[in-house]
Amino acid sequence: VDAALTGPVRLAGCSAPSRIVFGPHVTNLGDGRRFSRRHVAYYERRARGGAGIVVTETASIHPGDQPYERAPLAEGNGAGWAAIAGACRPYGTLVLAGLGHAGLEGSSAWTRSALWGPSRVAEPATRELPMEMELTEIAEVVEGFARAAAGARDAGTDGVEIDIGVRSLLRQFHSGLTNHRTDDYGRDRTRVTREVITAVRHTFRSGILAVRVCCDELAPWAGITPESARGFVRELAPLVDLITVVRGGLYSSHAYRPDFHVARNFNTELCRRMREVAGATPVVLQGSVVDPADAQRALDEGVADLVEMTRAQIADPDLVRRSAAGRAPRPCVLCNQTCQVLDPRNPVVSCIGNPEAGAEPCEPSAGKPAAPGEVLVVGAGPAGLEAARTAAESGWSVRLAERSSRLGGEVARAGALVPHLLPLVDWLGAECARLGVRVALDTSMTRGEVTREMRSGTWVLVAEGSDPSPDPSPDPSPPPADGPHWMSAAAVLDGVPDGAVVTWDPVGGPLGVAVACRLAADGRDVTYVTPDDVVGSRLAATGDLSGAGERLQRAGVRRQLRSDLAGWDGTGIRCRDRYTGETRLVRCDVVVDCSPGRSRHELDVPGANRIGDCVAPRTVAEAIRDGRAAARHVLEREPDPTSTIWRTTWDCSTAR
């Protein structure tokens, strides 16, 4: 990658080590509403990896704004900002304090007070009506931004970023969807933003003043459009030092950081149009930019001056350094599975391919690494590949035995159904090759062979995976000879018998929807059956809930919701309504079961370290986390070949 992306850049009198930005996002790493030591370790790791600018998790500038339980509050967070800035400073990374107010798109669950909004417009998901802000509240917001900027200044940050993007009060003032006022703040919708910028600039004169601006709400009937955004970007650009162009609003918050179903670099043209009117103010491209080559192209073509690669740096904190050295970074597959954590359960930010994300050590390890030895990994799915890679990276001699003819396990086998995951297993395989892992394909291990390896002092990690589920029907009788053919989702790519198909999805994840759409695209008559009230119930967390329903609708897939499978019939399968108990026959010739598999126990040898689906069939995230944890356990302990105790004291199912 050319030095323009990974080389230094000047910004408002400051120098950043690269043009790559790590943008603000929900982490749930806080101690209540305060930045924690985990925040410090999280941001320090990206700075160490070469990030040019780090924008901290957006802090609410008013105590009445708490959009999620662990949302940082600017008031009283000076020590946290200071610790983050101090940790990033040795690497030259610029730290900007993210400041914002969620307005009517916040939550009253924790504050128990009315939400604030420009007008009485309900948030679409919660239907909660805000109070229409009076001049007193508007003045409080302006003062709140100034006071927060002063705190960031005193903490030693390099500047602030004001949120005028998705889920922000200032954007709500800009938009005709949410601003129906008839006073000066309605006639001049950017007035409050200008007042905030002026107050912040007056308070933090020496700092960088950046803004994150929504330039398309995807609601042209009344919302912000690219054309209207050009007007206020032209107006605001002379007042600020940096502009990050984003999209998404009241009815399209999912469009801000969408998953892999949306094309990468989707904001390219939008950013180009804003840069045309921004004058000399640098502009940042945001929007599923995960490939350094794409980022470089955006710079070369004049789309932007810097590029935000937030999810890509969650996946690989060393993205900048790897790119500068000509090495491929660990890919971000844009699954949104564990990095999008705006969730009332407060999951901590992480990454399916990098389980250390969000769990960076706050202190140097006090343990002494074990002397390098021999490791045998049985099974080359995601868990086995990650275990082999981690051990080999630490200098251990690693062998990897895989009974099939290819690496990647079920991900590789079902590649056409989950193509977004293939780059991750390909990268793991390439890293194993680079690190000298000795791979033996078409090699099955026996219990006796595993036992002999363990007795010789070799650490053995078993990642033998899972098998397809049995017949999903509770009917104990086998399917009638002339009835529907049952098959697993993984077998779909090997060919599906002729006729109508039922896709049974008891999980609500991405696989069931992908299978149904794939079969419908092949011209099959498909009915999607789920026990849930909606299609893909678990996809809300990734931002794909509405998208999944839309794809099924466009594909012509029928839906049978709130239903369990009740038994076989000669012409189809019986489905029972979960609420009424009513049974309905769905005629079909094939049932594709998208249930989790059954753990394999062929190598269930006492003392063997089992990881991945052979412990419990879960997702790629848990498989890779198991692989990393098991390998780290090996690296940190010195085995005693004369003892068997150490071989039985750890299992990934009880690891913390």
Regions found by a protein language model. Give the residues of each.
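Hydrophobic, well-ordered secondary-structure elements that form the walls
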Residues: 243, 274, 298, 310, ...
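Flanking helices and flexible, charged tails adjoining ferredoxin-like Fe-S electron-transfer domains
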Residues: 197, 361-370, 393, 405-406, ...
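SH3/SH3-like beta-barrel fold
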Residues: 573-577
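Rossmann-like dinucleotide/flavin-binding elements
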Residues: 369-402, 440-452, 463-478, 483-540, ...
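Local beta-strand N-terminus motif with an aromatic residue
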Residues: 51, 157, 240, 304, ...
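Flavin-dependent oxidoreductase catalytic cores
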Residues: 1-378, 382, 386-390, 398, ...
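N-terminal glycine-rich dinucleotide-binding loop that anchors FAD/FMN and/or NAD(P) in oxidoreductases
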Residues: 329, 413-439, 478-481, 540-566
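Short beta-alpha connecting loops at secondary-structure transitions
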Residues: 254-260, 305, 411-417, 533-537, ...
